[in-house]
Amino acid sequence: KTTKKGIQYYREKQDERSLKQSESSLEYWVEQYQKSTAGIWLNFNTSFTEIRKQFEAGNFVVAYYKADRIFTSVQPKHVEKVQLKSGYAINEMPRTEFIKYLLDLKMTQALAISGGKTDKAHTIAIWFEKFEQLLKQIFDDESVKLVFDEETFQFSIEMDGREPFDFNTLSSGYAAILDIVVDLILRMERQLNRSFDFAISGIVLIDEIETHLHLELQKNIMKLLTTVFPNIQF
């Protein structure tokens, strides 16, 4: 009996010690979290379970962009089918395939025209028209044109008073904007089926959004983002 009592006493002490350690650890991590959020707490009117369900179905976007944003996209030497995903993890970078996706769209449009699929070809033509309009908003210049060279399979941007340039030779300010815009477009594109209506909901965190932007862009960047992506919480 004495032995059993001793064992029980030891277990109770161990459980008590373990509980105190757990409480201490929990208090530490809560304190660290509060420090990292600077006292800011997020409250959602939807459960995390529902958010996760929508995210996994591709109906909710979660993205994070660092302060040192530099847009880079692979320049393809030949046509390659881009397999867009219905959803991307926060650490994935679909924007790296953007130029490949543009080329894929152009070839799909050409095949649709030759195959008599006029509705499909028209949908893609409208997509490119709307993307060109978006570029005009970003550069704040109505002379902006997106030009495709059928010989080299390369896209370039042309505007009055400047030599043509491509997506990988943008100034740091415009590269920082396109890094966000293009990435979000591709995160939503499969679900929207080329509608260019980026109405999917989501949460996007941008570190030092004004970095690299000149004064005019700093004033207009949030208006641009919330107009193009009306249901994203930036």
Model-derived regions: residue spans:
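Switch/communication elements of ASCE P-loop NTPase nucleotide-binding domains
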Residues: 1, 153-234
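Amphipathic alpha-helical domain-onset/packing element
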Residues: 59, 106-149
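Residue-level recognition of the N-termini of beta-strands and the immediately preceding loop/turn
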Residues: 60, 144, 199-203
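Short amphipathic alpha-helical segments and helix-helix/interface helices
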Residues: 52-53, 132, 222-226
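A structural signal for short, well-ordered beta-strand segments and their strand-loop junctions
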Residues: 63-66, 143-148, 156
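Short, compositionally biased low-complexity segments
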Residues: 93-113
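P-loop NTPase switch/coupling surface
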Residues: 1-98, 126, 140
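Short catalytic/ligand-binding loop motif for oxyanion handling, primarily in non-cytosolic enzymes
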Residues: 71-75, 97, 111, 166, ...
